[in-house]
Curated annotation (Swiss-Prot):
It comes from the Eukaryota. It comes from Rana latastei (Italian agile frog). Disulfide bonds join C27-C33. It is found in: Secreted. This is Brevinin-2LT. The lineage of its organism: Eukaryota, Metazoa, Chordata, Craniata, Vertebrata. Pfam families: Antimicrobial_2.
Length: 33
């Protein structure tokens, strides 16, 4: 149903956000921005 689709989409978005946050953190830590 629609709710399961939304949940899947939410998980996907959360993964992408977490990945980009980790990337920017690594960038700041290593100074390789």
């Amino acid at each position: 149903g629609l709710m399961s689709v939304l949940k899947k989409a939410g998980k996907h978005v959360a993964k992408n956000v977490a990945a980009s946050l980790m990337d920017s953190l690594k960038c700041k830590i290593t100074g390789g921005c």
